[in-house]
Amino acid sequence: DDQTAGRGQRGNTWESECGKNLTFSTVLYPTALEAKEQFHLSMAIAFATVDALENYTDGFSIKWPNDIYWKDKKIAGILIENELEGKFITQSIVGIGLNVNQEVFRSSAPNPVSLIQILGVTINRQELLDRILRGIMASYIFLEKDYKAAVHNLRQLYIRRLYRKE
């Protein structure tokens, strides 16, 4: 429930007040995903996260490649680390940091926002976590069972939700 060394891409840090946010990792074991296709997994994770957030309000978008925004403010970051065997991904560690109930941000991050700031009410973190994990698993299973159809659908959904795509 407390993250002490949150990180993002290129060594950036992630600030999280103890007991207020979601900072978690989950491990996936792809069976036939090539390293060159790793972005398809990233699309699935980002979409599942946005989809879960849209149960609370709208206005969320995906800032390529791995940030979730509400309007012009960052609410979440996603980091995926893959292990390879030959040209295939054998393990993916998916880390997500999501601002839920934190009201004050002290870091130098330029534009953080949390669900409590957006909605004005405390959010049940366990319920939100369950929604995100269910979405991740549904997207992941779809990728594993019908890769071509899943990629086609995810690409359309992802593009529709891109931040500043105009």
Where are these regions (language model features)?
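Phosphate/pyrophosphate-binding loops and the adjoining catalytic core of nucleotide-dependent enzymes
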Residues: G6
